[in-house]
Structures are given as C-alpha cells and as structure tokens.
C-alpha cells in the first residue's frame, strides 16, 4: 500500500482542515476513467501504479482513481497536489513552509499516536506493532520530489513516493532538495516525530526516512510525444484539431511557492475554497514535440526514388509507380501542410539531382536514397544537417576557391520558385551547401517554423498564462489555412 495514500486516509479524520485537504480519489469509490497506458507514480496519491492522462495537461501522471477529481499540478486551486508543487528557484524559506505544511497536516505527537493505536487495537491479534497496521504513522517528512522541465520552467512535485527503483515511464524524475535545506535540521525534525512511536516502529521510520532523504537526484528527462494523451496524438493529422483541457481554479493570488502557507490560516483557506471553479480551454497543438511527431511519421513513408524520376505530377500525387507512389491512406497525409512540405522538398531535390547527375529513371538504385529519408525531420538539427551534407556530396559538387558548388538548372514548381526568391533573393543557377540548407529549411518553416515554437504544447502552461493568452484569443493560434510565414 502507498504510504502517502494511507497517511492521507487516516489523517483526513482528525480535523475539518484535513478532511478538506487530504481528500484523494484513490480513497473514494472508484468511478469509470480513461484507460491506463504507462507505469509510474500518481502525483496526486503518490502510489506507483498504471497511469492515465490528466485532463488539465494531457500528460500521464494520474491514476484511474484520482482522475475523477481532475487535479493537475498546474492548477491554481490550492488543493494538496498544487500546494506540494514548487516552481523554478526553490529557496530554503520555501522548503521551511513545505515542512510546516507537512507538520500541520500530518502531526505526530503522543495524542495522535495513542489515538491511532487505540483505534487499531480492535482485536487481540493486533496488540503487537506490525508495520502494515501503522503505515500512516511511518511517513517521514522528506524533500523527495518528482521534477519536470517544461520550456524553461522546472516544477518540483513533493511527496512521499515508495519504491523509487520501480519502472518509470513518465517524464518526471526523482530530485532530492535536501542540500538546499539543512540535513541536520531535517534529521532533528524527524527524530522528534519518531520519538513518539513505539520502539518497534521507530526502526522502520528511520529506515524510510534515510532512504528517501539521502538518495542522489536523477538526470532530468526530456518530454516527448509519448508522454501525452494518445487521443491527442491520434488527432494531430487534423490541422484544425484543438486540445480541450480543464483546470481547477480559484480567486486566490500568491507567489507560486507560497501557496502551501495557506494551511496555517484555516479560515482563509476555506474562504479560498469557496471561490473554486473549473475553467475550460481550447489549445492549439502547435509545438516542437507534436511537429516532430508528424514529420517523423511522414519520414517513414518517404519514397526517395522520386528525385530521379520524370513524373509530371507532384510527389504525393504519383500513382501506379512501384518506386514513387506513396500510400495516401495514412492519416499523416490528411494534414495538407505535411503534403505541401513533402511535395516542395522533393521537387527541389529532384531539380538538384537532375541538374548534377545523369540518372534517367526512378527504378535506378542510387546512394543518395539512403540520406533522403532524413530530410523532413528538421527538429533533429544535427541529424538533418548530416543528411543534407551527404546529399550535397552525392551531387559531386565542383570546388572553386575552397567553396563547393552544385548546378541548379532544372525546372521547379512555382511554390519552390517563390521560396527561392524569399530565401536567397533570386532563382540561382548554382548553389552552395549553405544555400541548400537555407532553402530546404525555408520550405519546412513555411508551415512549421520550429524556431518560434515552444517545445511542449500550451497545455503545460499555468492558469495565469492561459488566461492572458485567452484574453488575446491566442490559445488557438494559426487557422488551418495560414502558414507560419503568413
């Protein structure tokens, strides 16, 4: 059983404040919820289990039981998960406030220990102190957290997470902030709490405390498309698709890391809860993570033989050709922007190949094909530049004054002509490697300009940011018919 979950369940009964703050979905009646997909720690109840996606940020960080409350660590309502979430620069004073909150919600003193032990000793067999019966008294105060970086903002979700070595398929990684506080001071706080426990439980408490307070922080993970709801991923091919999210909000305003101080003033906390409400947002899918997902899918269906062909139609419109026809039934081609990029990239590359190589049919086997498969995924800049460089070398460029040039005298379509004029100010007859890089990036940036994209979607914005964008109608950016350049 998860220690944090058990502790919330038992401590919820001791007073009115705890009854409001420590209410977890995992301790209530189970309700239908979205299917689980990954394994990790539920941020709400801290147990290691199968996770489903959060309705507030679409990432997988909540269990099926806790999903009924729809709590997200990015909410503005001061529920327990939000009060345990700190952001960016965490000071020693912030950590003191967190420890005070823990001590307020989960006190250990003689009265509390006697109360729980008396309620547990219902039968003769329960006279001895067995760990599983007193799990709720064995949660030490630590500075253990799960952290995540979202476009420059680092969030720390503090809690007590059991079994740290278990499989973790989420973008969160364990971080220990004890060095930012004071080890001896935290030791003293826990030793004082431990002193009220029976001797047989003190050893288990100490073991748990030191194992969760002396660990080495993990390397922070990179957020990828795999960490977001499969429902979102399956609809990325639709340019007009918007992500629907809900956030738990309140009228309370405070610095982000100061919310945990609310529990010190019970009346103020309940006044804030009276203003609690849910806000709905429609969010654009525009970000690097989702853009790269689409470009990677398209890359899997590339037919490189088109660059040596003589087809009169664009690359996505070739039919009945064994070497050049793509399968238009894949959903990735439903996004006209991906088709435009594919057509223009291959129209430009075919002009380069036809200008520099003596290849007359798409059935021929050429070395250049193996590098063309990576020309769409511009998000992986290093790999993309290597692919373009190898393509350039396959053209057997002529070197003049230590600069290599390739001919460019084959016809291209009007879209490519316009992009040539925009990127190099003319329709050139010869091109350097740098010119080719600029032109190919311009073709992709016309629709997906990753230079000005967030890495993660706006579903990972805080409520304050979402409200500011919503007032300017910017949460749904770029209509389906408008490119990034326009």
From Swiss-Prot:
Pfam families: Rota_NS53. Residues 317-486 are annotated as: Interaction with host IRF3. It is found in: Host cytoplasm, Host cytoskeleton. GO terms for cellular component: host cell cytoplasm; host cytoskeleton. Belongs to the rotavirus NSP1 family. Residues 1-81 are annotated as: RNA-binding. The C-terminal region is phosphorylated by host CKII/CSNK2A1. Phosphorylation of the DSGXS motif is essential for host NF-kappa-B inhibition. It comes from Rotavirus A (strain RVA/Human/United States/D/1974/G1P1A[8]) (RV-A). GO terms for molecular function: metal ion binding; RNA binding. GO terms for biological process: symbiont-mediated suppression of host cytoplasmic pattern recognition receptor signaling pathway via inhibition of IRF3 activity; symbiont-mediated suppression of host cytoplasmic pattern recognition receptor signaling pathway via inhibition of IRF7 activity; symbiont-mediated suppression of host NF-kappaB cascade. Plays a role in the inhibition of host innate immunity by inducing the degradation of key host factors required to activate interferon production such as IRF3, IRF5 or IRF7. Associates with components of cullin RING ligases (CRLs) including CUL1 or CUL3, which are essential multisubunit ubiquitination complexes, to modulate their activities. Recognizes the host NF-kappa-B regulator BTRC through the presence of a DSGXS motif in the C-terminal substrate recognition domain. Keywords: Host cytoplasm, Host cytoskeleton, Host-virus interaction, Inhibition of host innate immune response by virus, Inhibition of host IRF3 by virus, Inhibition of host IRF7 by virus, Inhibition of host NF-kappa-B by virus, Inhibition of host RLR pathway by virus, Interferon antiviral system evasion, Metal-binding, Phosphoprotein, RNA-binding, Viral immunoevasion. This is Non-structural protein 1. A motif (IKBKB-like degron (ILD) motif) lies at residues 479-483. Residues 42-79 are annotated as: Zinc-binding domain.
């Amino acid at each position: 059983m998860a220690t944090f979950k058990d502790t919330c369940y038992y401590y919820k009964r001791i007073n009115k404040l705890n009854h409001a703050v420590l209410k977890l979905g995992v301790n209530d009646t189970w309700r239908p919820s979205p299917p689980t997909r990954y394994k990790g720690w539920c941020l709400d109840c801290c147990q290691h289990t199968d996770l489903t996606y959060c309705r507030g940020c679409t990432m997988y960080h909540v269990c099926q039981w806790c999903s009924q409350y729809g709590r997200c660590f990015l909410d503005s309502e001061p529920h327990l998960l939000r009060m345990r979430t700190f952001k960016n620069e965490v000071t020693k004073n912030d950590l003191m406030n967190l420890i005070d909150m823990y001590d307020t919600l989960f006190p250990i003193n003689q009265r509390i220990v006697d109360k729980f032990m008396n309620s547990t000793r219902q039968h003769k067999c329960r006279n001895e102190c067995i760990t599983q019966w007193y799990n709720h008294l064995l949660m030490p105060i630590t500075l253990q957290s799960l952290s995540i970086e979202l476009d420059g903002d680092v969030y720390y979700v503090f809690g007590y997470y059991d079994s740290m070595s278990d499989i973790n398929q989420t973008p969160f990684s364990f971080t220990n902030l004890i060095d930012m506080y004071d080890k001896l001071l935290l030791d003293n706080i826990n030793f004082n709490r431990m002193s009220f426990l029976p001797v047989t439980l003190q050893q288990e408490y100490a073991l748990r405390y030191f194992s969760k307070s002396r660990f080495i922080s993990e390397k922070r993970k990179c957020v990828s498309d795999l960490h977001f709801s499969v429902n979102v991923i399956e609809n990325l091919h639709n340019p007009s698709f918007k992500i629907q999210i809900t956030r738990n909000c309140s009228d309370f305003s405070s610095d982000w890391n100061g919310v945990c101080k609310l529990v010190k003033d019970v009346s103020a906390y309940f006044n804030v809860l009276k203003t609690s409400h849910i806000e709905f947002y429609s969010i654009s899918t525009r970000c690097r993570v989702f853009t790269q997902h689409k470009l990677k899918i398209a890359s899997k269906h590339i037919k490189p033989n088109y660059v040596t062909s003589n087809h009169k139609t664009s690359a996505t419109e070739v039919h009945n050709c064994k070497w050049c026809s793509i399968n238009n039934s894949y959903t990735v081609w439903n996004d006209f922007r991906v088709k435009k990029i594919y057509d223009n990239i291959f129209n430009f590359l075919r002009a380069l190949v036809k200008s520099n190589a003596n290849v007359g049919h798409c059935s021929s086997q050429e070395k250049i094909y193996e590098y063309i498969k990576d020309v769409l995924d511009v998000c992986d800049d290093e790999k993309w530049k290597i692919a373009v460089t190898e393509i350039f070398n396959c053209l057997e460029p002529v070197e003049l004054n230590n600069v290599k040039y390739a001919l460019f005298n084959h016809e291209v379509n009007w879209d490519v002509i316009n992009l040539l004029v925009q990127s190099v100010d003319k329709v050139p007859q010869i091109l350097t490697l740098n010119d080719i890089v600029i032109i190919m990036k311009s073709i992709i940036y016309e629709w997906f300009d990753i230079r000005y994209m967030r890495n993660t979607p706006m579903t990972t914005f805080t409520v304050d940011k979402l409200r500011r964008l919503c007032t300017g109608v910017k949460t749904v950016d770029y209509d389906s018919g408008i490119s990034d350049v326009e």
